[in-house]
């Protein structure tokens, strides 16, 4: 058991997929107070992103100006996440793009930047990593959709990143929620063959194994693990911070105070869960088994236009193709190319009527 673990709570970042990263100020203040009292090591507040063409809340951007307004204890490290493709696909050079999003570390409350990337974009992330490191930030590289990758591909990627000599923590993510304990052990072993630094793990709960997989990861040498309050996160959600801390306190007597989270869980996040309905269930289990991106399930479950039959038909359709990446057009195709339409027609509506 690695007792030098770090708990990274990413409630606002991952949970924001349900409310467009728009959390009420009273909840934010209560969360920050409880997280500090629970001795959580790191909070990932949200994404750092360019302006979007639709409304998104403060934690979709997590600007330094906004962070400075928050009452964050100096004992807690602060992280933000960037999606590598938002940098790589921008109209700017990598250095220009990052300069628009980040200032030097000494001027920012942010300590750590996590870069989320798919395996086929890892090599392109090298410049992003170097530019951010030069600004003074700790760097995590987050390998998305790690399950199903063969050992030789995992080792090759680990060796490549090891050669950069600037990444502080190499994360692997169960993005589709389809890992079991054996998958976690296999991936860690493959990464360790060519990576000598710290390893982190980000679990999803499609199969109800998020906490179990996280504990297995810790037992096998992972030192950074992610969680969210009540598991709030995209699709089925994540390992629940409170449940994970209960296990760690009971098994290893680590220095966390889980009771500091109880009121936050019951008073604030339980009503949110009842409203947004994240959590494990049949459809998320089916999506995990068939490598379907969880956003498809979340989209259908939160849209009352889709009947249960239509959702199951869409899952069946997506099970026969590559649906591991979210694409709105694919969701439409799964429903026959269009969403449900009403039958009302305006023709002759005003015929022989006074208007």
Where do the language-model regions lie?
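Catalytic cores and adjacent flexible loops of soluble metabolic enzymes
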Residues: 1-355
């Amino acid at each position: 058991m690695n007792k030098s673990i770090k708990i990274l709570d990413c409630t606002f970042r991952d949970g924001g997929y349900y409310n467009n990263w728009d959390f009420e100020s009273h909840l934010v203040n209560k969360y920050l107070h409880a997280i500090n009292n629970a001795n959580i090591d790191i909070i990932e507040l949200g994404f750092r992103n360019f302006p979007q063409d639709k409304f998104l809340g403060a934690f979709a951007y997590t600007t330094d100006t906004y962070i400075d307004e928050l009452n964050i204890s100096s004992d807690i490290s602060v992280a933000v996440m960037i999606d590598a493709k938002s940098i790589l696909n921008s109209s700017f050079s990598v250095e220009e793009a990052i300069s628009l999003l980040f200032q030097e570390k000494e001027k920012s409350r942010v300590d750590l930047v996590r870069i989320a990337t798919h395996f086929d974009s890892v090599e392109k992330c090298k410049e992003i990593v170097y530019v951010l490191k030069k600004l003074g930030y700790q760097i995590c590289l987050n390998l998305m959709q790690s399950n199903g990758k063969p050992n030789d591909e995992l080792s090759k990627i680990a060796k490549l990143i090891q050669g950069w000599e600037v990444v502080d923590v190499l994360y692997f993510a169960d993005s589709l929620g389809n890992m079991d304990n054996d998958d976690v052990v296999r991936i860690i072993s493959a990464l360790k063959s060519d990576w000598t630094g710290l390893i982190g793990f980000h679990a999803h709960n499609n199969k109800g194994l998020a906490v179990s997989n996280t504990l297995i990861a810790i037992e096998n040498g992972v030192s950074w693990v992610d969680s969210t309050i009540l598991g709030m996160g995209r699709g089925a959600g994540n390992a629940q911070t409170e449940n994970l801390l209960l296990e760690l306190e009971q098994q290893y007597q680590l220095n966390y105070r889980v009771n500091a989270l109880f009121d936050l869980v019951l008073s604030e996040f339980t009503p949110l869960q009842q409203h947004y309905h994240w959590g494990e269930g049949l459809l998320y289990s089916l999506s995990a088994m068939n490598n379907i991106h969880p956003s498809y399930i979340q989209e259908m479950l939160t849209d009352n236009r889709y009947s249960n039959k239509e959702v199951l038909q869409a899952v069946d359709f997506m099970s026969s193709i590559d649906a591991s990446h979210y694409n709105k057009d694919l969701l439409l195709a799964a429903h026959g190319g269009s969403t449900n339409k009403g039958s009302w027609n305006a023709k002759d509506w005003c015929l022989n009527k006074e208007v």
